[in-house]
Amino acid sequence: MDDYLEAFVREGEEHVTSLNNALLELESDPGNEEAMDEIFRTAHTLKGNFGAMGFEDASDLAHAVEDLLDEMRQGNLEVTSDRMDRIFEGIDGIEACLDEIQATGDVDRDVTGTIESVRAVLDEVDGDGGSGTTTSSGDAGSPAGDGDVDATRVVDADTIDAAEDPVYHIHIDMGDSQMKGVDGMFVLEEATEAFDLLGAEPSPDAINDGEYGDGFELVVATPSDEVSDTVAAFPKLSDATVTAVGDDEHAPDADSGTEADASADDDADDAGTTADSGSSSGGSSAIDNTDTEIQSVRVDVDQLDELHGLVEQLVTTRIKLRRGMEESDREVLDELDELDKITSSLQDTVMDMRLVPMKKIVGKFPRLVRDLAREQDKDIDFVVEGDDVELDRTILTEISDPLMHLLRNAVDHGIEKPAVREDNGKDREGTITLSAERDRDHVLIQVRDDGAGIDHDTMREKAIEKGVKTREEVQDMPDDDVEDLVFHPGFSTNDEVTDVSGRGVGMDVVRDTVTRLDGSVSVDSTPGEGTTFTMTLPVTVAIVKVLFVESGGEEYGIPIKTVDEISRMKSVKSVDGEEVITYDETVYPLVRLGDALNVPDETRNGDGMLVRIRDSERQVAVHCDDVRGQEEVVVKPFEGILSGIPGLSGAAVLGEGDVVTILDVATL
């Protein structure tokens, strides 16, 4: 797929996400004019972009959606859930066309059925509302040459009276323009140069954005008596009607099929493409958005990954250089410190470039929750908080599916039917909240619902039934540990398998994915009140600071962020046959690194070093032979048969090409 097509698909996907979310706002508040304007503008842009790229079937589908939205905007059709279903069906068809273009470069799917389904709703409109003819919100679709023109629809009477030159009302018919924003802009520019433009309906900004039906209205003042001939020479318009305001005699109509010179059209198309994409995507004129667009630059993902790879190599080289210099020539250490500062700044910059706001993946979730709620006859209010919180692009991509699993779980298992909620003294409408917040170098993402919560007794019985735990084990198990069983593979409390969940897949995948990203996930539930799933994730990946420890002559790395204290080996006690140490009256299980990794220890009890891990990670103390220092390293996660090995998370390359294993203390 070439660069232009790739940019087209990317922009189209953004429009679809924007359209879905604005439609959800409109469905919940049919009187929301701002949402309706955004919806109509976006649908129009999609239609024009598809047409400009030659995807006529997709353009026709977007046109059908636009026509239906226009009838709603004019008040000819009421906004109902059933009609919104038809619009969403059209949006899904548009999204499928974009997917096909991305995969094959063309659209081969038959969208006729979807178009007919959308246009069938238009048949409900009296008159010719179902014919598919688009009219503007300003009634621009009706010709202005009927001898009864009211120019005060466009400008006030005082402005007309104050004009020094004769005033004319011009109805511009743009025909079936494929790029209304660009074409309207050219007509408006010509009118502004030729006449004194007193007003326009809709506004000039709206015309530049293509927010009109078949045409628009202009009121101008000019001493010229050749207004019709001047207007007929305007590029891009299909037809025009000129009427002298305050005079019963109409100026002659411009030639009814006047078209600008073809070569001029081609040039204008080429010149206007960038302007249209800039104005339509932002929802206001390109001039208004100039500063913002300059400050926000799209970076090609491949280039970003290449830059990130170079930084990794630079960091690795820095590590090798420092180790070599410390051993041979200390006079260059000052220069090395300067290199440290430079590479650290470069590293921070690249990491910041890789950060992407949560809204990039959250945008598709409101529609998901809405559709699932409709399928299950549930009333759900979906709330998003903190969608401007940023995460590394790789992490954000990886957690998209886990978040979807959690939301599906909240709809299916969490929120009750409206009648059940009412019987339990709750509002008929349930609430699911997706929130994100930054906590130093981590991001906390929560999915909360105010549903039924987890039934601990049911969970215990299911654990026994599936052979996960024995009856004796679950009887002594705290409720927190019982809740944690939801992450066990194949575990589900649903007796009935649904299309949404209940197959026992997904929750274990959520934990596996988050763990692989060096994060954690937990669940907290109160029966009758609701459930909260919390994912704790690092903001960035790859380059981390580690503590180097030695055991049996081998060197290992422990992420510094997991370390709470380093000390000499303390006295060891035995509790139920397990070795433990005591710190501040708290008992910590002892993990001897040599035993855990099956390498020979060079120390005995009472010797060596002790690394106590943060309680938030795991309440444990790790024994090793020696602590060698700390350093930032490039961590490469294990893949293939090495992935998933308890206690190991990846490897790092040090000076002289030495490879050090990075430990996963949570599973050690």
UniProtKB/Swiss-Prot annotation:
**Keyword Cell inner membrane carried by entry:** no
**Origin: domain of life:** Archaea
Identify the keywords attached in UniProt to this record, alphabetized: ATP-binding, Chemotaxis, Kinase, Nucleotide-binding, Phosphoprotein, Transferase, Two-component regulatory system
Q: Where are the residues of the annotated region Disordered?
A: 123-149, 243-291
Q: Disrupted gene: resulting phenotype?
A: Deletion leads to the loss of both chemotactic and phototactic responses.
| Compositionally skewed regions (Low complexity) per UniProt | 133-146, 271-286
What is any Pfam family matched here? H-kinase_dim
Q: Which GO terms describe its biological process?
A: chemotaxis
Database matches in InterPro entries: Bact_Chemotaxis_CheA, CheA-like_dim, CheA-like_homodim_sf, CheA-like_P2_sf, CheA_P2-bd, CheA_signal_transducer, CheW-like_dom_sf, CheW-lke_dom
Q: What positions are modified (Phosphohistidine)?
A: H44
Ranges for domain Histidine kinase come to 330-541
Which Gene3D superfamilies does this UniProt record tie to the protein? Histidine kinase CheA-like, homodimeric domain, Histidine kinase CheA-like, P2 response regulator-binding domain, Histidine kinase-like ATPase, C-terminal domain, HPT domain, SH3 Domains
Which GO molecular function terms does the record list? Answer: ATP binding; phosphorelay sensor kinase activity
Alphabetical list of SMART domains matching this protein: CheW, H-kinase_dim, HATPase_c, HPT
Q: Which CDD domains match?
A: CheA_reg, HATPase_CheA-like, HPT
Gene Ontology CC annotations of this record: cytoplasm
Keyword Hydrolase in annotation: no
The record describes its post-translational modification as: Autophosphorylated.
Q: Which residues form a coiled coil?
A: none
Q: How does it assemble?
A: Interacts with CheW1, CheY, and several transducer proteins (HTR-I, HTR-II, BasT, CosT, MpcT, Htr4, Htr6, HtrVIII, Htr16 and Htr17).
Q: Any idea what job this protein has?
A: Involved in the transmission of sensory signals from the chemoreceptors and photoreceptors to the flagellar motors. Autophosphorylates, probably in response to a chemo- or phototactic signal, and transfers its phosphate group to CheY. Could also transfer its phosphate group to CheB.
Protein's name according to its UniProt entry:
Chemotaxis protein CheA
Q: What is the lineage of its organism?
A: Archaea, Methanobacteriati, Methanobacteriota, Stenosarchaea group, Halobacteria
